[in-house]
From Swiss-Prot:
The lineage of its organism: Archaea, Thermoproteota, Thermoprotei, Sulfolobales, Sulfolobaceae. Zn(2+) binds at C128, C131, C153, C155. Binds 1 zinc ion per subunit. This is NAD-dependent protein deacetylase. It comes from Sulfolobus acidocaldarius (strain ATCC 33909 / DSM 639 / JCM 8929 / NBRC 15157 / NCIMB 11770). The gene is cobB. It is found in: Cytoplasm. One of its GO terms (molecular function) is NAD+ binding. The active site is at H120. It catalyses: N(6)-acetyl-L-lysyl-[protein] + NAD(+) + H2O = 2''-O-acetyl-ADP-D-ribose + nicotinamide + L-lysyl-[protein]. Its cofactor is Zn(2+). GO terms for cellular component: cytoplasm. NAD(+) binds at A26, T30, F37, R38, Q102, V104, D105, H120, S191, S192, N216, I234.
């Protein structure tokens, strides 16, 4: 019953907003089989974050690709879950204007979301660190799996996934901040809200007088600022919100 009441409240807040956005983190993709980073079964419990740093990539590109090709393969095998499709549906209904994500799996776009800001890049693309030529990561992954220890461009440059590694600047942060400044409601979904500067996006909306809904399995540093904090499973909760929105539409 509590889930139903929470979902109805979120539906009402979305319907009463003019410019709502979603801000998503790794937690939205765990139901797709992708581990998050900082949770009990998170990626950084198994590996050192150093492996995903630009310094490590530059010093040890062979070891980096050995690590990242395994991660890349698991991401390619993942499919969008009901939460991704729910956000795409909310955008199609005109109820959210953008999805700002920390994820590199590309699942929001696969699910049908159009206006997606990928702050940490997209692992489905790779590029040459010398000439900047773009590559399909599936092609690069196939080469690594066939034994190419360090995948290289035709020019000889080392290829790199088009993702933001630790020590690199975030993609599109100013565009994300512009969108946040124009928003009156943000749904922070599946994010620990600990990674700067991405974690400033929900705060911008809140500081401008907008609403903040946090949907996450673990506590976050911003729970105290939120209008609603929800601990339900994301892939179950968001479709429930859609159902309530449709019900409220029918009754109005």
């Amino acid at each position: 019953m509590y889930l139903v009441e929470e979902a109805k409240k979120v539906a009402e807040m979305i319907l009463s907003s003019v410019n709502a956005i979603a801000f998503t983190g790794a937690g939205i993709s765990t139901a797709s089989g992708i581990p998050d980073f900082r949770g009990p079964q998170g990626l950084w419990k198994k590996y050192s974050p150093e492996l995903a740093s630009i310094e490590y990539f530059q010093k040890y590109p062979d070891a980096f690709w050995q690590f990242y090709s395994t991660r890349m393969k698991s991401l390619f095998e993942a499919k969008p879950n009901r939460a991704h499709y729910a956000l795409a549906q909310l955008e199609k209904m005109g109820l959210i204007k953008a999805v700002i994500t920390q994820n590199v799996d590309g699942l929001h776009s696969v699910a049908g979301s159009r206006n997606v800001i990928e702050l940490h890049g997209n692992m489905r693309k790779s590029y040459c660190t010398s000439c900047l030529r773009s590559y399909d990561s599936l092609e690069v992954l196939a080469r690594v799996e066939k034994g190419e220890v360090i995948p290289r461009c035709e020019c000889g440059g080392i290829l790199k996934p088009d993702v933001v590694l630790f020590g690199e600047p975030v993609h599109g942060i100013y565009e994300a901040m512009r969108i946040a400044n124009e928003s009156d409601l943000v749904l922070a979904i599946g994010s620990s809200l600990t990674v700067y500067p991405a974690n400033q996006i929900p705060l911008i909306v809140k500081r401008n007088g907008g609403g903040l809904i946090i949907l996450n399995g673990e506590e976050t540093p911003y729970d105290e600022y939120a209008d609603l904090v929800i601990r339900e499973r994301i892939e179950i909760f968001l479709p429930e919100v859609i159902s309530h929105i449709q019900s409220l539409h029918r009754s109005s």
